[in-house]
Regions:
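Phosphate/dinucleotide-binding and metal-coordinating scaffold of catalytic cores
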Residues: 1-280, 284-402
């Protein structure tokens, strides 16, 4: 966005019209508190906020509206770019997000922002320019939709009708080659049969690219709510909770044992892969605007955190009153406490362990980050060894990556 465009922005925003799947839904305002008031018979903005005659008042902005706001790097970048022209707070970020945020909620405060030129995925993956690519993408796309999280990332528009929008992530000095780390973990998840979006890793290892999954096959956006929102918690409480409650929320909202089992599979995968950052915002449910077909969203934001010395060697949430990574037996006991049979849970854990080991054995990128492969393998061995069970890793030579 040019300086002239920035000069036309209002200094402050206190009223934002909220839409669900392009249908006017209500008005969000700020005075001494935040207030959201539905229009008559409008679709609900959240599974936790049914349409009601009176307003939803809150001292802080409602979780469903804050869940996709940028954190850390991107938020600081936006604030710095606009600081001479606007007071960038949560309401302002919603207005800037417009219709390009994750999920089917969109926001209108009358801002007119220019469209950014699209970029082909191939140009990102095979970048060979002298200057670093990510700063250029950030400059072009920092207002092109937003995604939560502290990792440097930007939403990039697809260059063709067949190419969906993607999220491009980089890394900083604290977490070197986090791009490789996440790519490897996501490929392991795919190998294990979890529902994953398409992902890519650039030739120079500087960029991890993931396809957006917040639209159905017809291109209609779906609702997406992370578990902090579903539990009525602000994002800064994303590490407060238990995996037991994660599964309870799934059961309550889907009334489906299959979805509960799928969520257990994802929780168990995070434990086996050594992801200590599987917090409430890294799980979500998705659904249509009429709140039908509620199901677990595809896997996202999975990394092997144990390899980084600045991150505690423990889980993000508690399981059975502890944040220590569980053993196989403890995972099975956890599943049983949530209504899943021990035999089903045991098979899930064993199959995941086999899948992770087999994927690491054949995925070339697992060797692109020094120590990553051995660290994951060591953690996996420790989890399974605690129960004196050695998984038999079957290697399917027919299964390959493309």
């Amino acid at each position: 966005m040019t300086t002239n465009n920035l000069a036309g922005l209002p200094e402050r925003i206190n009223r934002v019209s909220v839409n669900v799947a392009n249908q006017e839904t209500g008005l969000l305002t700020r005075s001494s508190h935040f207030s959201f008031l539905y229009t008559k018979e409008a679709p609900a903005v959240s599974l936790t906020m049914p349409n009601q005659p009176g307003p939803y008042n809150s001292g802080a902005l409602h979780p469903v509206f804050t869940q996709n706001l940028p954190e850390g790097y991107l938020r600081r970048y936006i604030s710095e770019k606009l600081r001479r022209h606007a007071d960038v707070d949560d309401m302002y970020l919603l207005a800037l997000m417009g219709a390009k945020g994750i999920g089917h909620l969109s926001y209108d405060a009358g801002l007119q922002l220019p469209e950014s030129e699209p970029v082909a995925i191939e140009d990102i993956l095979h970048w060979s320019g002298k200057d670093k690519l990510f700063p250029q993408l950030l400059e072009r796309y920092y207002l092109n939709g937003m995604a939560s999280g502290v990792q440097p990332k930007v939403v990039v528009s697809g260059s063709t009708l067949l190419q969906k929008d993607v999220i491009v992530k980089a890394f900083d000095d604290e977490f070197p080659l986090l791009t490789v780390n996440e790519f490897v973990c996501m490929k392991c998840a795919e190998y294990c049969g979890l529902n994953t979006p398409k992902v890519w890793l650039s030739d120079d290892l500087q960029h991890y690219v993931v396809e957006r999954f917040d639209a159905d096959e017809s291109g209609t956006k779906v609702g997406i709510e992370d578990f902090a929102t579903l539990m009525g918690r602000p994002g800064d409480q994303k590490y407060s909770g238990t995996y037991e409650n994660v599964l309870k929320v799934v059961r309550l909202n889907t009334n489906s044992l299959e979805q509960v089992e799928e969520t257990f599979k994802l929780v168990a995968f995070n434990c086996l892969i050594g992801n200590g950052d599987a917090h409430l915002k890294n799980f979500s449910l998705q659904y249509h605007a009429d709140h039908t077909e509620i199901q677990l969203s595809p896997v996202y934001d999975v990394t092997h955190t144990i390899i980084y010395p600045t991150i505690d060697n423990e889980m993000a949430l508690k399981m059975r009153k502890s944040k220590a990574f569980p053993s196989r037996r403890e995972l099975v006991d956890f599943a049983y406490s949530t209504g899943i049979s021990r035999s089903t849970a045991g098979k899930v854990v064993d199959n995941l362990a086999e899948g992770i080991a087999a994927c690491l054995a054949r995925l070339d990128e697992a060797n692109a980050m020094e120590g990553l492969k051995s660290s994951i393998e060591g953690h996996l061995h420790n989890v399974m060894e605690k129960s004196h069970i050695q998984p038999v890793y079957r290697h399917d030579k027919k299964k390959k990556y493309y």
